[in-house]
Design a protein with these regions (language model features):
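Short, flexible loop segments at the rims of nucleotide/cofactor-binding pockets, characterized by
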Residues: 54-59, 153-155, 173
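Active-site rim beta-loop-alpha module in soluble metabolic enzymes
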Residues: 126-170
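Metabolite-binding pocket within alpha/beta catalytic cores that recognizes anionic/polar moieties
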Residues: 1-123
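Generic hydrophobic/aromatic pocket-lining and core-packing "Φ" positions
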Residues: 67, 165, 181-184
C-alpha cells in the first residue's frame, strides 16, 4: 500500500472512497489519524504531516511516530509532498522538482529508530528510483518538472537568511524546505520506499528582491494543491506493486 504524507489541503474526499480512519499507537507517541481510502481500485493511506488542523510546526512534527504508524498499517511505499523555496538558477515558482538527494541542516530532531544499538543505514540512494520515476511521469504532463535535484532541509520554523541560502547553494542545494528530513531517513530505516514531490512555492531568501510573508506562502501553497493532487493521483497509478529497489 502507498502512503501519502502531506498537508491537509491535498486530501480531497470527493475523489476517494474512505474505508477507515485509524488511530495508531507507537512507541514514539500516538498518531491520531491515518485515513485509509480507495481510488481507482487501489488502497492508499493518507497521513497529515502537521496534524488534522495543520497546527504542528515543522520542528515539532513527530516524524518517528508517523513513519512507524504508516509501516504498522501496511504501507510499503511513501509519496511525500513538500512546498519548497527555489535556490537553483533553473527554478521558478510553480516548477516541480523530484529530488534524488538531500542535505540535512536540521538539529535536535529525533532522526533514527536505532538509539539503542549500532546500525548504519545506507543512504547512497535515499529516494526510491521507481517512485521517483512514477512522480516524474505524472508531473511531466502537468507542470515543468526537473527529474533530479538536491533538497536541503533546515530546522525552521523561521525562514532562512540570505547567507544561509548562499551556503546551501554553494554546497549543492537546489531547493530548501523544513520537513523532508528526517522523514526520508526514517522511511529508509523501516525499509519503506520513499519519494518526494517538491513544489517550488517561492524563491528562497536573497534569490529574489521580493520578500515573502508566511501568510503569502500559505496562500501560494493552497493555490498549488490541485496540481499536487493530480501529480499524486497519476503517480499512485504508476508505482509498481512489486519494486526492485534495494
Amino acid at each position: 500500500m502507498i502512503g501519502i504524507i502531506g498537508g491537509t489541503g491535498i486530501y480531497d474526499p470527493k475523489s476517494v472512497k474512505e474505508i477507515a480512519v485509524k488511530e495508531v499507537e507507537t512507541p514514539y507517541g500516538d498518531v491520531p489519524e491515518i485515513k485509509i481510502v480507495e481510488f481507482n481500485g487501489k488502497q492508499v493511506a493518507f497521513l497529515p504531516r502537521h496534524g488534522k488542523s495543520h497546527a504542528i510546526p515543522p520542528h515539532r512534527v513527530n516524524y518517528r511516530a508517523n513513519i512507524y504508524a504508516l509501516k504498522e498499517v501496511g504501507v510499503d511505499g511513501i509519496i511525500s509532498t513538500n512546498s519548497v523555496g527555489g535556490i537553483g538558477d533553473f527554478l521558478k515558482p510553480g516548477d516541480v522538482m523530484i529530488p534524488h538527494d538531500f542535505l540535512d541542516f536540521t538539529r535536535g530532531r529525533e532522526s533514527t529508530f536505532y538509539d539503542d544499538r549500532v546500525v548504519h543505514v545506507d543512504v547512497s540512494s535515499p529516494y526510491c528510483p521507481e517512485i521517483r520515476n512514477a512522480l516524474i511521469r505524472a508531473a511531466g504532463s502537468i507542470s515543468k518538472v526537473f527529474s533530479n535535484g538536491v533538497y536541503a532541509c533546515t530546522q525552521g520554523p523561521r525562514f532562512e537568511t540570505p547567507s544561509e541560502i548562499r551556503m546551501i547553494k554553494t554546497l549543492g542545494g537546489d531547493v530548501v524546505g523544513m520537513t523532508g528530513v528526517p522523514e526520508v531517513v526514517l522511511a529508509r530505516e523501516k525499509e519503506i520506499c520513499y519519494g518526494s514531490v517538491c513544489i517550488v512555492a517561492n524563491f528562497a531568501a536573497g534569490i529574489s528582491e521580493e520578500k515573502l510573508t508566511a501568510t503569502e506562502l500559505t496562500e501560494i501553497v493552497k493555490e498549488n494543491e490541485a496540481m499536487v493532487r493530480k501529480i499524486i493521483t497519476g503517480a499512485v497509478e504508476n508505482v509498481p506493486e512489486h519494486r526492485k529497489c534495494e
